[in-house]
From Swiss-Prot:
Belongs to the phosphohexose mutase family. Its EC number is 6.3.4.23. GO terms for molecular function: ATP binding; ligase activity, forming carbon-nitrogen bonds; magnesium ion binding. Keywords: ATP-binding, Ligase, Magnesium, Manganese, Metal-binding, Nucleotide-binding, Purine biosynthesis. Catalyzes the ATP- and formate-dependent formylation of 5-aminoimidazole-4-carboxamide-1-beta-d-ribofuranosyl 5'-monophosphate (AICAR) to 5-formaminoimidazole-4-carboxamide-1-beta-d-ribofuranosyl 5'-monophosphate (FAICAR) in the absence of folates. Its cofactor is Mg(2+); Mn(2+). The gene is purP. Binds 1 Mg(2+) or Mn(2+) ion per subunit. Mg(2+) binds at residues 268, 281. 5-amino-1-(5-phospho-beta-D-ribosyl)imidazole-4-carboxamide binds at residues 20, 85, 229. Pfam families: DUF1246 (PF06849), DUF1297 (PF06973). This is 5-formaminoimidazole-4-carboxamide-1-(beta)-D-ribofuranosyl 5'-monophosphate synthetase. SUPFAM superfamilies: Glutathione synthetase ATP-binding domain-like, PreATP-grasp domain. InterPro entries: ATP-grasp (IPR011761), ATP_grasp_subdomain_1 (IPR013815), IMP_biosynth_PurP (IPR023656), IMP_biosynth_PurP_C (IPR009720), IMP_biosynth_PurP_N (IPR010672), PreATP-grasp_dom_sf (IPR016185).
Length: 333
């Protein structure tokens, strides 16, 4: 990326939107000696982030004109770390236009905004997925309906049969109908490292969702709004398969999307009682589930580095090593 060639590598700054995983990202960046910038969309949000001494600057900007803020980030010698709030609040169009060097495959942000393209990419990678129905007439079992975008489960709903599905789809647009797979949820955290030439299984979590995980006693319809995350240590016999799916996904991104995957990403799945895995979604950037081991380090990071490391630190470590080796352009698009 030509912008990086003009940067002073001794004065790199790391920036991200003040939400989602910003605390983890910026804490890790500061630990590795980078200047840090949090970008808030509201004054009250900015006030919260200003209290942390590992954040050097907090900007308040209008996300509707993020490209202008990105130009200032270039002037500040900053690289940008995308996450779910960036995808949702700024949007893929501005994400593609923003001139600031962005970690990972920038084009993947556009794919992430379309549920059908997400499933296509998983399938192209040879990863087992839940069945997708194009119309209610095809439905012959319970399904879950998901809205497009990184909405943290908001608006998702279950339908037990096609009649219920038709009724609840009235007035909706931009959604996908998926088979509801029975089992337990598991969300796998990966890191694709151009510096070390490998895909790392970094951790896993379970989402804590309102109100499906609450005390509803059957009185209300289940909803799936993510309010937090719970830690998960996977059965070791599952790890080879989970790692393989992560590798296959990284290869699919490079072959289908046309850019190399670099940095954190996530495959979201159900594990059945026969230990088979059905992947129903991906996130092509850091996920909020990595916050469960912020400051402590993930259970698998010690396997790669012989010391605990959280995902924010892992990102900063990769940036530092790439800068030392003259390979920042392998990380940023």
């Amino acid at each position: 990326m030509s912008v990086l060639k003009r940067y002073d590598l001794e004065k790199l700054a790391v920036a991200t939107v003040a939400s989602h995983t910003a605390l983890q990202i910026l804490r890790g960046a500061k630990k590795y000696g980078f200047r840090t910038i949090a970008i808030a969309g509201r004054a009250d949000v900015a006030e919260f982030y200003q209290q942390f001494n590992f954040i050097d600057e907090v900007w308040t900007v209008d996300f509707r004109n993020f490209v202008k803020a990105a130009e200032k980030l270039v002037e500040a010698n900053a690289v940008f770390i995308p996450h779910g709030s960036y995808v949702e609040y700024v949007g893929w169009r501005q994400a593609l236009e923003a001139p600031v060097p962005t970690l990972g495959c920038r084009e993947l942000i556009k794919w992430e905004a379309d549920q059908y393209k997400k499933m296509e990419l998983l399938q192209r990678g040879g990863i087992p997925t839940s069945r997708v129905y194009k119309t209610p007439e095809e439905v012959d079992r319970p399904v879950i309906v998901k809205l497009f975008g990184a909405k943290g489960g908001r608006g998702y709903f279950l339908a037990r049969d096609r009649e219920e599905l038709r009724r609840r789809l009235a007035g909706l647009s931009d959604y996908i109908i998926q088979e509801y797979v029975f089992g337990v949820p598991a969300y796998y955290h990966y890191f694709s490292s151009p510096v070390y030439g490998r895909v790392e299984v970094f951790g896993a979590d379970i989402r804590y969702e309102s109100n499906v995980d609450g005390r509803t006693f059957g009185w209300v319809e289940p909803t799936f709004v993510v309010v937090g995350n719970l830690p998960l240590v996977l059965r070791e016999s599952l790890l080879p398969t989970i790692w393989k799916y992560g590798v296959q996904f990284a290869k699919a991104v490079e072959e289908v999307v046309g850019c190399r995957l670099a940095g954190p990403y996530c495959l979201e799945s159900i594990i059945r009682d026969d230990m088979s895995i059905s992947v129903f979604e991906f996130s092509g950037r850091i996920v909020a589930g990595t916050n469960i081991y912020m400051g402590y380090g993930s259970p698998y990071s010690v396997l790669y580095f012989d010391r605990p490391m959280d995902m924010g630190e892992r990102i900063a470590h990769e940036i530092r090593e790439a800068a030392r080796r003259g390979r920042l352009e392998d990380l940023f698009t």
